[in-house]
Every structure is written in structure tokens, then in C-alpha cells.
């Protein structure tokens, strides 16, 4: 079980990094829009980049894997305003699908919460320790 949790956590942290990269690309490509939601970063196939679906991430991630999460984690992006976002990955079942939750804000640093809590505010995420990688 520990090996599965470790694999899930590694995948979740990697997805948060992917979301950071996509946010930088989105805000660069659509500066008047600001940062994008999960849906705005994705787009259904065949994907043609537009503000509502920029084709920067796989549409499976953009839909949080049809609302079911992936590898034991749920993914979300909260837009605070055009200049701030919080990307999160939280365990579906803390202690069995994952222990740590992960988040990142516009500084691009992935942080972890050993309690597995949802840290969907800029202040909550920013107060956590950076993931050591």
C-alpha cells in the first residue's frame, strides 16, 4: 500500500507542475484573460486553441478525469482574480490513496500539506513548505 501511495503522490505532484507550466503559457497567450481554469487550459479533441479551451493540457486532466480524479487524487484550479490562481491536488481518500496534498500558486513552487487538506487559497498554499525535489 505504501508503494501505491508513493506512486500516486509522485503523479499528483507532477500534474501540479504540469498545471503551473500551462498557466504560464495561458497567461502569456491570453494576457487580457489572466490565468485559466482547468477547462480553459484543456479542450476537447480535435483541439483548436481558443480562450475557452487553449489545448495546453490533456482534456482528461482539464475535466478532472470526468470528475473522478486520477491516481487517487482530485485536481482543481481556483482563480482568485486575473493575477492569482491556486492549483491543487488532494487525495480522494486521505491515508489510502494519498497522504499529502499538493498545491501551487503563480510563483510556480509546488508545496505539500502532510495532512492531505485542500489548500485552495493563496494564503493557505503559500504558507506550506515547498516540495523538496
Regions found by a protein language model. Name each.
Residues 1-25:
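Amphipathic alpha-helical segments typified by the pilin-like N-terminal helix
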Residues 18-100, 104-109, 114, 127-133:
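Extracellular/periplasmic head regions of type IV pilus-like filament subunits
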Residues 116-120:
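A short acidic/small-residue loop/turn micro-motif
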Residues 122-124:
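Short, charged, solvent-exposed linker or helix-capping segments at domain edges/interfaces
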Amino acid at each position: 500500500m505504501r508503494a501505491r501511495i508513493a506512486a500516486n503522490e509522485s503523479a499528483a505532484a507532477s500534474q501540479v507542475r504540469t498545471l503551473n507550466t500551462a498557466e504560464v503559457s495561458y497567461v502569456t497567450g491570453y494576457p487580457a484573460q489572466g490565468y485559466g481554469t482547468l477547462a480553459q487550459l484543456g479542450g476537447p479533441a480535435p483541439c483548436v486553441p481558443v480562450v475557452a479551451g487553449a489545448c495546453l493540457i490533456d482534456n482528461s486532466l482539464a475535466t478532472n478525469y470526468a470528475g473522478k480524479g486520477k491516481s487517487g487524487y482530485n485536481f482543481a484550479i481556483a482563480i482568485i482574480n486575473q493575477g492569482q490562481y491556486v492549483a491543487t491536488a488532494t487525495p480522494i481518500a486521505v491515508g489510502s490513496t494519498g497522504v499529502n496534498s499538493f498545491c501551487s500558486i503563480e510563483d510556480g513552487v509546488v508545496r505539500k500539506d502532510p495532512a492531505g487538506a485542500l489548500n485552495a487559497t493563496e494564503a493557505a498554499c503559500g504558507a506550506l513548505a515547498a516540495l523538496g525535489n
